[in-house]
């Protein structure tokens, strides 16, 4: 009964969510697009000519935002967008996509080959592991995903490049922040308005490699 009530509450909240309605109006595949838009505007990131890597890209709303930001005359992408996700993603015009598990060495190597030594301006990561509800185990999974994004960014970003990554407050969060501060000159936390109030998610914006 409680589970059924929770499901009904979630459906009601989802249907009445202004960001869900706005995403539908603007043609975004998910409300998460507005989280990225707010961060990009606040940080003045992502412009034409940039090379952008989108980790955890499905269903594609962040790739859609990147395509809009990089669109030049005639709507052609001025720059490059490479997206990766474990799940399939419907094509986004101008976006190169790899389907695979970012935690696997073989997939990381495939992504590195696609980047092909080209310096990356911005890495955006909306990746989130499957959570079990067991605090210690979940914290370890979250920390692992954030560390993988960090290692990839440090290997491929330009010296003045940036990384936007989703994290969650809780056990292990301070260690994630500390590890980012060890590698970047500036690290800030952002909680976009489109993030639901009850959600523990927060986004780290790391800029300028040390």
UniProtKB/Swiss-Prot annotation:
GO cellular component: cytoplasm
Keyword annotations from UniProtKB, A to Z: Cytoplasm, Methyltransferase, rRNA processing, S-adenosyl-L-methionine, Transferase
Binding-site residues, S-adenosyl-L-methionine: 60, 62, 85, 101, 126
PANTHER family: RIBOSOMAL RNA METHYLTRANSFERASE, RRNA METHYLTRANSFERASE 2, MITOCHONDRIAL
Function, as annotated: Specifically methylates the uridine in position 2552 of 23S rRNA at the 2'-O position of the ribose in the fully assembled 50S ribosomal subunit.
Location(s), subcellular: Cytoplasm
Gene3D superfamilies, A to Z: Vaccinia Virus protein VP39
A Pfam family: FtsJ
List of catalytic residues: 166
Predominant location: cytoplasm
Protein name from the UniProt record: Ribosomal RNA large subunit methyltransferase E
Catalysed conversion reaction: uridine(2552) in 23S rRNA + S-adenosyl-L-methionine = 2'-O-methyluridine(2552) in 23S rRNA + S-adenosyl-L-homocysteine + H(+)
Coiled-coil annotated spans: none
CDD domains the record matches: AdoMet_MTases
Entry EC no(s): 2.1.1.166
Gene for this chain: rlmE
HAMAP family: RNA_methyltr_E
Enzyme class: transferase
Molecular-function GO term, any one: rRNA (uridine-2'-O-)-methyltransferase activity
Protein family membership: Belongs to the class I-like SAM-binding methyltransferase superfamily. RNA methyltransferase RlmE family.
């Amino acid at each position: 009964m409680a589970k059924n009530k929770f499901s009904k509450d979630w459906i009601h909240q989802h249907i009445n969510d202004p960001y869900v309605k706005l995403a539908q109006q603007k043609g975004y595949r998910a409300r998460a697009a507005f989280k990225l838009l707010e961060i990009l505007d606040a940080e003045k990131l992502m412009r034409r000519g940039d090379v952008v890597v989108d980790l955890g890209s499905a269903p594609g709303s962040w790739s859609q935002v990147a395509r809009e930001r990089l669109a030049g005359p005639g709507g052609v992408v001025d720059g490059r967008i490479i997206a990766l996700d474990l799940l399939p993603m419907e094509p986004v015009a101008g976006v190169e996509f790899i389907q695979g598990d970012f935690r696997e060495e073989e997939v990381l190597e495939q992504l590195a080959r696609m980047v092909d030594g080209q310096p990356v301006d911005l890495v955006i990561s909306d990746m989130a592991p499957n959570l079990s509800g067991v605090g210690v185990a979940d914290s370890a999974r979250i920390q692992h995903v954030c560390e993988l994004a960090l290692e990839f960014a440090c290997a491929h970003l330009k010296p003045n490049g940036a990384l936007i990554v989703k994290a969650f407050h809780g056990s292990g969060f301070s260690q994630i922040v500390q590890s980012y501060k060890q590698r970047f000159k500036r690290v800030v936390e952002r909680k976009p308005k489109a993030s639901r109030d009850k959600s523990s998610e927060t986004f780290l914006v790391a800029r300028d490699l040390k």
